[in-house]
C-alpha cells in the first residue's frame, strides 16, 4: 500500500495592492476675520507661522492674539460678571473659560503653585493670571477678556495672504490662513476607491 503524501495548509489574508501617485502639500487656506471693530493698525507678515500666544495683527493698536482650543470665546470673561440689568451674577463657568485657562497655563501664567486653576470657573485668581498675560502684551491690566481680543484655532497657523491692509476698517476678512501640518492628496478613480480606507 503506497504511503500518502501530506502538505500543510496555511491560511492567509488575500491582499490587493497598487501603487498610486500622491502629492504632499499644505492644507487649503481659510479666511480669518478680526471681530474687534476699529482700524487695522498691524498685520502679521505673509508666510509667518503663528503659534499659541502669537499676535495675528492689531486693531486700534491692540494686538489680536491667537489661542489654541476647540471652542471660541463667546462672551466677556471676567471675575466680576454682571447681568443684563447691571447687577452682579454668579461666577462664569463653561467651556470658553476652560479654553482661556488652558491657554494661560500653556503660556506659563497658570502654574502648579498659582491660585488660579484650570477648572472651568473664572475666579479672581483667573483674573490675576489674565492681568499678568495682559502685562506681557503691553495692554492695560484689566483682568477682562473680550471675545474680539483673540482668535481661537485648533492648531498653529501659517499666514497665506492678506485680505486687508493697514489703515482699513476691520470687520471683513483680514487674513487667509492654513494649518501648518501637511496633507497627502491622491487622485483616485471611482473603481479604485475600494483599495483605500480611512486612516
Predicted regions located by residue number:
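Short beta-strand segments of a lipoyl-like beta-sandwich/carrier module
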Residues: 5-11, 16-52, 56-57, 65-89, ...
Amino acid at each position: 500500500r503506497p504511503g500518502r503524501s501530506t502538505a500543510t495548509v496555511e491560511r492567509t489574508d488575500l491582499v490587493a495592492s497598487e501603487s498610486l501617485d500622491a502629492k504632499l502639500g499644505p492644507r487649503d487656506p481659510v479666511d480669518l476675520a478680526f471681530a474687534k471693530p476699529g482700524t487695522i493698525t498691524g498685520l502679521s507678515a505673509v508666510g509667518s507661522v503663528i503659534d499659541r500666544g502669537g499676535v495675528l495683527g492689531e486693531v486700534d493698536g491692540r494686538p489680536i492674539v491667537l489661542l489654541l482650543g476647540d471652542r471660541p470665546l463667546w462672551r466677556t470673561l471676567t471675575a466680576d460678571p454682571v447681568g443684563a440689568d447691571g447687577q452682579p451674577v454668579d461666577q462664569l463657568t463653561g467651556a470658553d473659560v476652560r479654553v482661556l485657562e488652558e491657554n494661560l497655563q500653556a503660556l506659563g501664567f497658570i502654574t502648579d503653585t498659582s491660585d488660579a486653576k484650570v477648572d472651568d470657573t473664572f475666579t479672581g485668581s483667573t483674573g490675576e493670571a489674565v492681568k499678568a498675560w495682559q502685562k506681557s502684551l503691553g495692554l492695560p491690566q484689566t483682568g477682562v477678556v473680550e471675545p474680539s481680543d483673540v482668535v481661537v484655532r485648533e492648531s498653529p497657523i501659517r499666514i497665506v495672504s492678506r485680505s486687508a491692509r493697514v489703515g482699513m476698517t476691520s470687520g471683513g476678512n483680514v487674513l487667509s490662513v492654513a494649518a501648518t501640518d501637511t496633507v497627502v492628496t491622491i487622485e483616485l478613480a471611482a473603481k479604485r476607491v475600494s483599495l483605500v480606507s480611512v486612516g
